[in-house]
Amino acid sequence: MTAVKEPIALLGSPAAEGPSAVVLLDEQVRHRTRHRADRRFLLVARLASLAGFLIVWELASGTIVRPFFISSPTAVVEALVEWIQSGELWFHGQFTLLATVLGYVSGSLAAIAIAWPLGLMRRAYRITEPYFLIAYSVPAVAMGPVFILWFGLGLTPKVVLAAYFVFFIVFVNTVTGIQQVPRGMLDVTRVLGASRTALLWTVILPSALPYILAALRVTLPAAMIGAVVGEFIASNRGLGYLTRAAAAEYSTAGVIAGVVVMSAIVLTMTLLLRPLGHALRWQQEVKVNRGTV
């Protein structure tokens, strides 16, 4: 009788690991397929809704609403083209972008540097908390004239105001992230003989990092707002100044064009920061704390 040779499954292949591995692999493939389909649907839906909005806006301008109030997409595009051809967009945009980036970075670093030791020393945080609460209760826009009086009319007050808009959001979330570390985890790590430095890098930092990154992702618009508010108050350059000049000329298209450019800058910078969130997918989703200090 001739022996029947059965196929030998390769080590590590789905066949060698049993039916459960095949089912798991199929489920992963279906999940990826659904994810790609959802992303395509979202992209198409967003583009379609944007196109519909622009069409309705264009049709409503001059027929339902006076162009003075809402302008029109074609007029906004014409204003943008004029700024690009004259070089105004790049000239003013670079100052706003510089103030936004410097304010964002300096405000975030200052917030983390101050919040980190206070988060570790709860008694010190409770002592200083009222002072941060008082500073946080002051409307950030109201600090614009103060910073201009202190630092003059150059780039510095715009950077400081942008940093002020960023500081408290990052500060509150950093302190929250540090204080959310489970006490039991700290005790177990100490019992195992971990040094203070090891405790900081292996337990506290990984637990607080999602809170910090969540704050960093949402404070970019705040930094842009701070820089533009400073340009609105007193400046002869920047997108805030360019938009204010358009408003002084009663150019609705110019005002909307300035808003579009600022939104595009913030959106681009936010997309550049998105990989920071993907790097911590294993962490639980964290909501940014915008509440009191």
Predicted regions and their residues:
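Periplasmic/extracellular loop-to-transmembrane helix junction in inner-membrane transport proteins
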Residues: R30-D38, G62-S106
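N-terminal signal-anchor/first transmembrane alpha helix
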Residues: R30-S61
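Alpha-helical membrane-protein architecture signal
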Residues: V77, S86, W90, Q94, ...
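Transmembrane-helix boundary motif in ABC transporter permease subunits
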Residues: L102-F132
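C-terminal transmembrane helix and the adjacent membrane-cytosol boundary/short C-terminal tail
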Residues: R122, P210, I256-V293
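Short cytoplasmic-facing helical segments at TM-TM junctions of multi-pass membrane proteins
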Residues: P130, N173-V218, L239, T243
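Generic hydrophobic transmembrane alpha-helix motif, especially the helices
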Residues: L133-I169, T176-G177
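Transmembrane alpha-helices
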Residues: V160, Y164, R196-G230, A257, ...
